[in-house]
């Protein structure tokens, strides 16, 4: 009893024991006959039947066959693309495959649709010729008064245009051709008496000699324009100064804009210009200092910075001295220190001027309580490039200065 209960029905056991279901002929099944499909297709009784059911079966078979063929083709293309990516990289492999025709561009497939879009974008890029042959040839007509570009004339007159331009126009879209013609040097309007780069290169050594002559002999108009540009620069940098004063300073500096700016800055250019006699005095001082520059450069070693009237006095001072000392406090004449208060220089400008870059920016010290027992060497004895102006100013007889801050501060004459 227990064995009979555990045993299943005989039909299920027989179905499980048998082999899997074999495919049957669909045409025979439509007509009520069951026949195995293996070896039956050629001998089927209804293989040429045109009834509705058999026609539907034939259409279904055709669609399935097309899908299988498409999947096989896509799988083959993916394998080829994967191999090319391993060999040449991602983008280069796809571009090389598309160029060689291994993979035709398909708009409905993402990988190869990007390749086709890249090829279209490359065709629309404007192309430029380094040495256009149309410029070298003398077949180009002179520019008309209307100012039309050469590309319009070449389009209207087919006999005038060069074959290179026609070949370039054939490869690409019309929009790309118009952009390439507009951006190319061929399309720029030619003025009367103006030479193109192609004509200049075709002239040879004669044109080179003429260019050298032009460079060696500058025209007076170019010199005048350069001088005007220098004065304009000075007027823009110093709008509060008069133009005549700036012209005097520029002439004294040999028409050097940088040197003129340094002269004006060192003579109080940042402050507002003085009125009356003091303004003329400042202009005369700037002009004299600019004229003294060639003589000083001829006698002494060449220096990149101009020598101002107060430059030597400033260079002989120690870094520990006050930036703007009171001259009567040191017992000296107020007029002996030219960079005093009459020029309107504040300690900030004195510390960051062109000739005091070697001085450290610090608060002024009082000279009464700064270690009076120590004798400081003058700054000329130190090997600072910004402080050394002339080696002849060194103390030959005294190795150290007699005073605390040097001869100029202590109002002692310098021994030569």
From Swiss-Prot:
Listed SUPFAM superfamilies: Cysteine-rich DNA binding domain, (DM domain) (SSF82927), UBA-like (SSF46934)
Classification via Gene3D superfamilies: DM DNA-binding domain
Renumbered residue ranges of the record's region Disordered: 133-226
Pfam families: DM (PF00751), DMA (PF03474), DMRT5_DMB (PF20624)
Main subcellular location of this protein, as a coarse class: nucleus
Compositional bias of kind Low complexity: 133-145, 198-208
Stated name of the protein: Doublesex- and mab-3-related transcription factor A2
Source organism phylogeny: Eukaryota, Metazoa, Chordata, Craniata, Vertebrata
């Amino acid at each position: 009893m227990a064995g009979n209960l555990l045993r299943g029905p005989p039909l299920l056991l027989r179905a499980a024991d048998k082999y899997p279901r074999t495919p049957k002929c669909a045409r025979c099944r439509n007509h009520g006959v069951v026949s195995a499909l293996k070896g039956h297709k050629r001998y089927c009784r209804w293989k040429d039947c045109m009834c509705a059911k058999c026609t539907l079966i034939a259409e279904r078979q055709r669609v399935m066959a097309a899908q299988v063929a498409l999947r096989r083709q896509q799988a083959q293309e993916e394998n080829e693309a994967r191999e090319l990516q391993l060999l040449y990289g991602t983008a280069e492999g796809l571009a090389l495959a598309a160029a060689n025709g291994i993979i035709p561009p398909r708009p409905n497939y993402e990988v190869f649709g990007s390749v086709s879009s890249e090829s279209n974008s490359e065709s629309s890029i404007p192309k430029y010729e380094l040495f256009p042959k149309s410029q070298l040839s003398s077949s180009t007509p002179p520019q008309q008064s209307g100012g039309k570009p050469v590309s319009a004339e070449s389009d209207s007159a087919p006999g005038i245009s060069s074959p290179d331009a026609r070949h370039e126009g054939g490869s690409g879209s019309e929009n790309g051709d118009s952009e390439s013609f507009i951006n190319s040097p061929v399309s720029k309007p030619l003025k009367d008496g103006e030479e193109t780069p192609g004509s200049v290169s075709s002239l040879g050594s004669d044109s080179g000699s003429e260019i050298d002559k032009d460079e060696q002999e500058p025209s007076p108009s170019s010199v005048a324009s350069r001088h005007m540009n220098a004065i304009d620069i000075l007027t823009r940098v110093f709008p509060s100064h008069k133009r005549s004063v700036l012209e005097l300073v520029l002439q004294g500096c040999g028409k050097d804009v940088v040197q003129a700016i340094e002269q004006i800055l060192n003579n109080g250019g940042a402050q507002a210009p003085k009125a009356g006699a003091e303004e003329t005095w400042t202009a005369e001082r700037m002009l004299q200092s600019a004229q003294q520059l060639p003589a000083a450069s001829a006698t002494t070693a060449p220096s990149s910075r101009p020598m101002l009237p107060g430059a030597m006095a400033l260079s002989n001072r120690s870094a520990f001295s006050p930036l703007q000392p009171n001259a009567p406090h040191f017992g000296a004449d107020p007029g002996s220190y030219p960079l005093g208060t009459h020029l309107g220089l504040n300690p900030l400008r004195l510390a960051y001027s062109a000739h005091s870059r070697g001085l450290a920016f610090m608060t002024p010290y009082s000279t009464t309580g700064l270690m009076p027992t120590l004798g400081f060497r003058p700054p000329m004895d130190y090997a600072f490039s910004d402080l050394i102006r002339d080696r002849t100013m060194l103390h030959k007889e005294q190795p150290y200065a007699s005073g605390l801050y040097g001869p100029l501060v202590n109002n002692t004459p310098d021994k030569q």
